[in-house]
Amino acid sequence: MKKKLIVFHPAIAPYRVDFFNSIDEIFDAKFYFEFDNALEQTFDQKRLQEYLSFIPKYLSPGFLGIKNLRFDVLSILWKNKADVVFISEYNLLGLLVCLFKILVNWRLKIVTVCDDNVKMAQNASWVKRIMRYVMLHILSAVILADPKSMEWYGTSLKYKAKYCYFPIIQSDAIFRERLKQASSFICIFNKEV
């Protein structure tokens, strides 16, 4: 029987599709997104969703306009009885998941995915440092996309959480097809210029 997993993530982005699909294949997974598109970039969501092996769900807007304060996370966790929860970075949503673990299900495994490089980790704002400090005492693991960050975390932040390096992945076959499409577009673009 597959373990139950809930993923809370900001948005669907092209570089996360294969990662999410891999998770969906291995776990009995449910995916909840905070936004219908990435805040810093705009992607063709309709097209991206064609590549997903799951149906995405979306969280209600942040409480009092605070983007990461989404109390429906607590009811989702209560109803779904997950074994593992994936969150993104260190934020209020992640703190709510940690609070749920402390108050309701101490055996819940919480894993965060962090894209910080070493400079970002070292120069984090005091708010992020406090959240990171609190959460690293509760999290089961931190997945870091940069090997140097993992090394820095291991030597500078010795807390309960385990650190592991896992690069942003894409299926090789899909990547090669997209590269081929992009190359033909570049050729067409260069001829027009």
Each model region followed by its residue ranges:
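N-terminal subdomain of nucleotide-sugar transferases
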Residues: 1-57, 80
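Histidine-centered beta-alpha loop that forms part of the nucleotide-sugar donor binding/catalytic region
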Residues: 10, 89-90, 112-118, 167-169
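An aromatic- and histidine-rich active-site surface loop
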Residues: 14, 84-106
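Donor nucleotide-sugar binding/catalytic pocket of nucleotide-sugar-dependent glycosyltransferases
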Residues: 137-191
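A short, charged, and often flexible helix/loop element on the N-terminal side
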Residues: 50-72, 87-89
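A short helix->loop->beta-strand "cap" motif at the edges of active sites that frequently abuts
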Residues: 105-110, 160-161
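A short, histidine- and acid-enriched strand-loop-helix "catalytic/donor-clamping" loop
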Residues: 108-126, 140-141, 172
